[in-house]
Amino acid sequence: MKTIIALSYIFCLVFAQDLPGNDNNSTATLCLGHHAVPNGTLVKTITNDQIEVTNATELVQSSSTGKICNNPHRILDGINCTLIDALLGDPHCDGFQNEKWDLFVERSKAFSNCYPYDVPDYASLRSLVASSGTLEFINEGFNWTGVTQNGGSSACKRGPDSGFFSRLNWLYKSGSTYPVQNVTMPNNDNSDKLYIWGVHHPSTDKEQTNLYVQASGKVTVSTKRSQQTIIPNVGSRPWVRGLSSRISIYWTIVKPGDILVINSNGNLIAPRGYFKMRTGKSSIMRSDAPIGTCSSECITPNGSIPNDKPFQNVNKITYGACPKYVKQNTLKLATGMRNVPEKQTRGIFGAIAGFIENGWEGMIDGWYGFRHQNSEGTGQAADLKSTQAAIDQINGKLNRVIEKTNEKFHQIEKEFSEVEGRIQDLEKYVEDTKIDLWSYNAELLVALENQHTIDLTDSEMNKLFEKTRRQLRENAEDMGNGCFKIYHKCDNACIGSIRNGTYDHDVYRDEALNNRFQIKGVELKSGYKDWILWISFAISCFLLCVVLLGFIMWACQKGNIRCNICI
């Protein structure tokens, strides 16, 4: 009896060696996969607010260098002078005479140190001179007759002596007369001329007659295109530098071929010449950031910023080729594929699961690739062609976004007088609306680009899979998880031919068909076929043993077999 049971057990073991799936020498497994990282980056697409990708680039510049770079733009530091003070010739701003700039930087510590003045349209004059980019001044010989020139004031010291604005000529009575002044100055040049002039407003009637004789003066400045008539307003004003009188500053632009006419019977602050007007992209900015030796195309009041990103939220005010201002603190552009972190699976094929299962964190030499298992072991290799195809289409994406958004001009500060408050409110509303619109457009643009990138990288993966499937044809079976079961012996050279596209399926066709039919004849189409086969085998062995035991007991009862039990 022992002999029979032993023979039965040996028979079962021999049978077990012939179960399908135990001979891996005649088959191989090839899986396609893509790159993955342990911790990806979340980006936004049209269809998903948060989708993880292997790599992404930040598109919003959110910090400055903290200093204004002096290259490539020519920066003129106003230090203690405003641009208008430098224009008029305030004594402490004499160092700015005939200066040029791309960007004039006004400081919060700037102050006036001459006769108190106001400019009725200060912002327009400031912007006009700033955009010209120069304080180049040409003296002209105006013929003022019967009056005293070069008036000065103790409120405008030039050294120890009383002085005045260097670009203006204060005219007052000569003796006891102030004759009517009527002078002309033609523009025979080929460029516009900017004339700065003013009207003096005495604080009392006595001051008025002491300086100009007449109780009421009048100043008229005209060209062929315009005329301005100003009547002085005599009256006391708040005291500034020991004076309660004021000067109002005006300007006139004389075109080539036009003529300047000045008529006055008193209170005239006359021009000494003209400023050359130039056209360009010069500007002005209020900032307390220091000026440093560095290079940057984009300048904000906070300091220079790089312009290698399409958007910035450092400051609305900019100069140069700058990223577009948006409200968002961050906008990320996907520069990698959809990230599916690798799962630590177990099992015969768990270690080389395909792209449908999860990504491959170990693949660092490409975005797409192959893993295989054959009689020579396991291996992995990247597919450089599909990787390069995806990279080529993504590489130019950032530059294209920058080209669409970077401003090649500056966003200047806008100022309005108090009486223009409603205009200022409207301007602010328009600017805020523009920023809202650009912020929305930026988010939409990035979401569209991210959607395209993910669709593109998914498409390249599918192209590689289809290319492999067309090569293998009936020699392999698609296992449905990104892997192929190859029904012929496929060594490393064979695997390499599949990867590089030189695989000849006809060479292996007969072997593959033969192996497929042999395996399929006994293979169960279930996800648990191996378990079912082993359970069936165990039950069969158990039943065989029961039958043998029953036969032995029956034979013992009939006397054909004698069984002695010794204790």
Curated annotation (Swiss-Prot):
Location(s) in or outside the cell: Virion membrane; Host apical cell membrane
Membrane topology field: Single-pass type I membrane protein
A Pfam family reported for this protein in Swiss-Prot or TrEMBL: Hemagglutinin
Extent of the signal sequence: 1-16
Lipid-acceptor residues (S-palmitoyl cysteine): 556, 563, 566
Swiss-Prot/TrEMBL GO biological process terms: clathrin-dependent endocytosis of virus by host cell; fusion of virus membrane with host endosome membrane; fusion of virus membrane with host plasma membrane; viral budding from plasma membrane; virion attachment to host cell
GO molecular function, one term: host cell surface receptor binding
UniProt keywords, alphabetically: Clathrin- and caveolin-independent endocytosis of virus by host, Clathrin-mediated endocytosis of virus by host, Disulfide bond, Fusion of virus membrane with host endosomal membrane, Fusion of virus membrane with host membrane, Glycoprotein, Hemagglutinin, Host cell membrane, Host membrane, Host-virus interaction, Lipoprotein, Membrane, Palmitate, Signal, Transmembrane, Transmembrane helix, Viral attachment to host cell, Viral envelope protein, Viral penetration into host cytoplasm, Virion, Virus endocytosis by host, Virus entry into host cell
Keyword Membrane belongs to the record: yes
Extracellular topological intervals: 17-531
InterPro entries, sorted: Capsid_hemagglutn, Hemagglutn_HA1_a/b_dom_sf, Hemagglutn_influenz_A, Hemagglutn_influenz_A/B
Site (Cleavage) location in chain: 346-347
GO cellular component: host cell plasma membrane; membrane; viral envelope; virion membrane
Transmembrane stretches, start-end: 532-552
Ranges per topology, Cytoplasmic: 553-567
Disulphide bonds in the chain: 31-483, 69-294, 81-93, 114-156, 298-322, 490-494
Post-translational note: Palmitoylated. In natural infection, inactive HA is matured into HA1 and HA2 outside the cell by one or more trypsin-like, arginine-specific endoprotease secreted by the bronchial epithelial cells. One identified protease that may be involved in this process is secreted in lungs by club cells.
Positions bearing carbohydrate: 24-25, 39, 55, 80, 143, 182, 302, 500
HAMAP family linked: INFV_HEMA (MF_04072)
Record-stated family: Belongs to the influenza viruses hemagglutinin family.
Quaternary structure (record): Homotrimer of disulfide-linked HA1-HA2.
Miscellaneous: Major glycoprotein, comprises over 80% of the envelope proteins present in virus particle. The extent of infection into host organism is determined by HA. Influenza viruses bud from the apical surface of polarized epithelial cells (e.g. bronchial epithelial cells) into lumen of lungs and are therefore usually pneumotropic. The reason is that HA is cleaved by tryptase clara which is restricted to lungs. However, HAs of H5 and H7 pantropic avian viruses subtypes can be cleaved by furin and subtilisin-type enzymes, allowing the virus to grow in other organs than lungs.
Function noted in UniProt: Binds to sialic acid-containing receptors on the cell surface, bringing about the attachment of the virus particle to the cell. This attachment induces virion internalization of about two third of the virus particles through clathrin-dependent endocytosis and about one third through a clathrin- and caveolin-independent pathway. Plays a major role in the determination of host range restriction and virulence. Class I viral fusion protein.
Name recorded for this polypeptide: Hemagglutinin
Organism this protein belongs to: Influenza A virus (strain A/Victoria/3/1975 H3N2)
